[in-house]
Amino acid sequence: MSKKLFIGSSLLSKEQTGSVEFQISHLTNRVLKLTDHLKFHDKDYSSQRGLLKILGKRKRLLSYLSKTNLTSYETLINKLNIRKLKNR
């Protein structure tokens, strides 16, 4: 899914592309595309490294969102079918 189509299909407006919720949704879209790519190209180590970097960034953003706005965090988790963060 292209970025413009993704922005149009998301619940957020075009002015809110910098919001944490949109960034997490966009990173989730990139994760899905990279995992599909890695199913066919399992020795593409640079893409694996990029996937790990994206997952780390998404994890940090999810942690920030859970601390600042718990209700938005829970609705986003349910909408994107992502597992909740582990509590330490």
From Swiss-Prot:
Key words of the record: Chloroplast, Plastid, Ribonucleoprotein, Ribosomal protein
InterPro entries in UniProt: Ribosomal_uS15 (IPR000589), Ribosomal_uS15_bac-type (IPR005290), uS15_NS1_RNA-bd_sf (IPR009068)
Source organism, top-level taxon: Eukaryota
Pfam families with a match to the protein in the record: Ribosomal_S15 (PF00312)
One GO term of the biological process aspect: translation
Compartments it resides in: Plastid, Chloroplast
Molecular function terms from GO: structural constituent of ribosome
GO cellular component: chloroplast; ribonucleoprotein complex; ribosome
CDD domains: S15_NS1_EPRS_RNA-bind (cd00677)
Subunit structure as annotated in this protein's UniProt entry: Part of the 30S ribosomal subunit.
PANTHER family from the UniProt entry: RIBOSOMAL PROTEIN S15, BACTERIAL AND ORGANELLAR (PTHR23321), SMALL RIBOSOMAL SUBUNIT PROTEIN US15M (PTHR23321:SF26)
Similarity comment: family membership: Belongs to the universal ribosomal protein uS15 family.
Descriptive protein name: Small ribosomal subunit protein uS15c
